[in-house]
């Protein structure tokens, strides 16, 4: 073979080898794992369920540290609109989520569970509460959530459906604060969610509200537009919507939409 032809063959061989090497590297390189802190702002009624969701998600993604920010949905909404860092927002109603979307902080939220209201009473129901009509009895100590939070809005809607004008002694900042007062015997009754009564393991009793008067609370979730950790935020939302996430939520009394 002539010297010039040999040189051409060697150059071609080196180019092919280089291409083959780069192809192998690109196909065998591992995909980046989810890492970092994940800030989840969630309604107070999700406290127990999301604690288990957090543990399950972290077990599947050991590089992620989920930080739950729990409270009234209206307060969480304000935090987000005022620029507080958050990756995921899970609200106990659609109106707070709608305001976040309208402000350009999120898009395409998904309803992931529903919930129903229930009258919460101290263990043994010492005041003998039988229904919403008892909320008009001035001699009883009655509590609701504040009117600007979902559980308060839904409670007033249920009372209106039943034609009851309530005699209210306290309005609590979120559903867990109301539940705590009922559990301590400081109130004869309050209106919470079915899931909150269930979470006490029997230290709070529940009186059902008739279907015609009750209100279905739809819970939306979304990865926020300005999420500091967008990849983990999207993965967390996907997990909540997955069969595994729904199984966890069902154990706490939530119902799939």
Specify the residue positions occupied by each region the protein language model found.
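C-terminal motif of bacterial Sec signal peptides marking the signal peptidase cleavage site
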Residues: 13-18
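Exported/periplasmic ABC-transporter solute-binding proteins
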Residues: 19-59, 65, 74, 78-81, ...
């Amino acid at each position: 073979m002539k010297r010039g032809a040999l040189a051409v063959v060697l150059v071609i061989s080196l180019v092919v080898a280089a291409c083959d090497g780069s192809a192998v590297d690109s196909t065998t390189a591992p995909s980046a794992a989810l890492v970092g802190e994940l800030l989840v702002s969630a309604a107070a009624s999700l406290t127990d369920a999301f604690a288990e969701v957090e543990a399950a998600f972290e077990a599947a993604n050991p590089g992620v540290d989920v930080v739950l920010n729990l409270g009234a949905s209206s307060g969480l909404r304000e935090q987000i609109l005022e620029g507080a860092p958050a990756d995921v927002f899970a609200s106990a109603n659609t109106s707070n989520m709608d305001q976040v979307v309208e402000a350009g902080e999120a898009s395409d939220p998904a309803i992931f569970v529903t919930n129903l209201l229930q009258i919460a009473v101290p263990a043994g129901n010492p005041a003998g509460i039988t229904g919403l009509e008892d909320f008009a009895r001035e001699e009883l100590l009655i509590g609701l959530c504040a009117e600007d939070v979902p559980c308060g809005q839904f409670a007033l809607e249920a009372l209106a459906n039943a034609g009851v004008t309530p005699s209210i002694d306290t309005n609590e900042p979120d559903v867990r604060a109301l539940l705590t007062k009922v559990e301590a015997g400081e109130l004869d009754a309050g209106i919470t969610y079915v899931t909150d009564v269930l979470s006490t393991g029997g230290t709070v009793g529940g009186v059902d509200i008739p279907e015609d008067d009750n209100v279905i609370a739809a819970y939306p979730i979304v990865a926020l537009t300005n999420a500091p950790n967008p990849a983990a935020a999207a993965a967390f939302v996907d997990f909540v919507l997955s069969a595994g996430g729904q199984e966890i939520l069902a154990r706490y009394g939530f119902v799939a939409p």
